[in-house]
Design a protein with these regions (language model features):
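Positively charged, small/polar-rich N-terminal and surface patches that mediate targeting and assembly
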Residues: 1-107
Length: 107
């Protein structure tokens, strides 16, 4: 079983998942999973952020080693953060244990 990992989530406007994957692979991540989603932000949220919020989203999930998590989050922010057309947010959650991740992560 693998330990010492974080799950990084990036929620971005639809069509920007490839940019996320390019950015995180440059930091040492090996891959991720993309899920199509729909946002539910209301007009008040749009007024607060001062931007138009698209309801069509993609969620990119990437399991990374803890030691590269900060650089992965920074790369996502720089590539598709709120001030970009991707209008993304990113966060991480600890992974207590994982199995079946393949040889790359279990070494």
């Amino acid at each position: 079983m693998s330990k010492g990992y974080e799950m990084v989530f990036a929620i971005i406007n639809s069509g920007y998942s490839e940019e996320v994957m390019e950015a995180v692979k440059a930091c040492g991540a090996t891959g991720g999973t993309v899920i199509n989603a729909r946002g539910t932000a209301n007009l008040e949220a749009e007024k607060f952020f001062g931007i138009s919020i698209s309801s069509e989203k993609e969620i990119v999930m990437i399991i990374v080693k803890k030691d590269i998590k900060d650089s992965v989050l920074k790369a996502i922010y720089e590539k598709v953060g709120l001030s970009t057309p991707g209008q993304g947010i990113a966060f991480s959650l600890p992974v207590d244990e994982a199995v079946g991740l393949g040889k790359t992560l279990e070494e």
